[in-house]
Amino acid sequence: MFTSFLIKYAEIGIKGKNRYLFEDALVRQIKYALKKCEGEFLVHKTQGRIFVDAESEFDYDEVVAHLQRVFGISGICPVVHVQDEGFEKLCETVIDYIAKVYPDCNQTFKVAARRARKNYPKDSMTINMDMGEAILKAYPNMKVDIHHPDIMLNIEIREEIYIYSVILPGPGGMPVGTGGKGMLLLSGGIDSPVAGYMIAKRGVKIDAVYFHAPPYTSERAKQKVVDLAKIVARYTGPIYLHVINFTDIQLYIYEKCPHEELTIIMRRYMMRIAEQIGKETECLGLITGESIGQVASQTMNSLIATNEVCELPVYRPLIGFDKQEIVEVSEKIGTYETSILPYEDCCTIFVAKHPVTKPNVKVIRRHEHNLDEKIDELVKTALETKELIIAEA
């Protein structure tokens, strides 16, 4: 019975003169999401509302599922919309709507009319009262409750009239692309895909870089990361995944540097490489899944040491999350089951038994100096031979 959806948004509504830019971005994201659904749809905005009108047969559950992944949407309202053929005809439509959506017809209700078209002959208060009277006459077992109704019956009077009573939750946030672009350091673990999701929710378009270490990490480990990128892409749109062969760099660091500093020094080179790719692709920052104190490389001292090599800002959406909170988000967005597949990352292969937790930046720099010009050549080769994979849902 539903042929349209009214899209609600929250934060966009408090924007100033540039609000239309955010609305236009949200319309684009909705159109992109619906391309993967059966059917034809018209997406349009009018007077602080965005509507999705189905122009052919469609799968209701499929459309709702795709809309619930579009950042910027706070609510999705399946609506019945009709032409204005007079108030009596509107009452008949509403009574029929209640019979189909709430067949028991014994709930409490409230009518909430919004008259966006000011030349409509009844004002909002009169619509509420007259419609309530018609409903009570048709369904004597129903009762009015203006404070805590079972059914909030919304009627929007525009060029057409829209009727809805259900608001399905959206993901919230801001439309992807309105917050700039960032480079995500993506691994096969639980944290980094969640970090990508969280930063994208704030409107940031993400690319990603993955550090692969064959033969120490398998093709299955690489495919796992590609699969994670595809899952995150359900929410973000296509992700350009840059795959770096990190093996020679890791082996050289392992040979030349103290083993307790391996993780920090390797991490610093990952940040350098990610930043170089980020600058080439017009990213405004790096994004990681780090959380304070979770592992040795994520103490505040360690984060200072890794930040020191970057000119771009480093965004850490999970910095104050504990592990269980991160797991809960990963389960919600669908990455958890893939993240726990038992394929090793490059960071887990070359791990010291006793990694330093309070690295001294001056000491780290001195040990990096031992890597001489060869490390620059290895980095250059890694960048020249990187693989680009476009991950789409």
Predicted regions and their residues:
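RNA-binding accessory domains that recognize and position tRNA/RNA substrates
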Residues: 1-183, 193-239, 248, 308, ...
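Active-site adenylate/phosphate-handling loop in enzymes that bind or generate adenylated species
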Residues: 133-135, 172-179, 250-251, 255-328, ...
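Structural beta-sheet core signal
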Residues: 184, 208-210, 243, 288, ...
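S-adenosyl-L-methionine
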Residues: 233-234, 238-261
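Small/polar glycine-rich anion-binding or flexible loop at a beta-alpha turn
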Residues: 294, 342-350
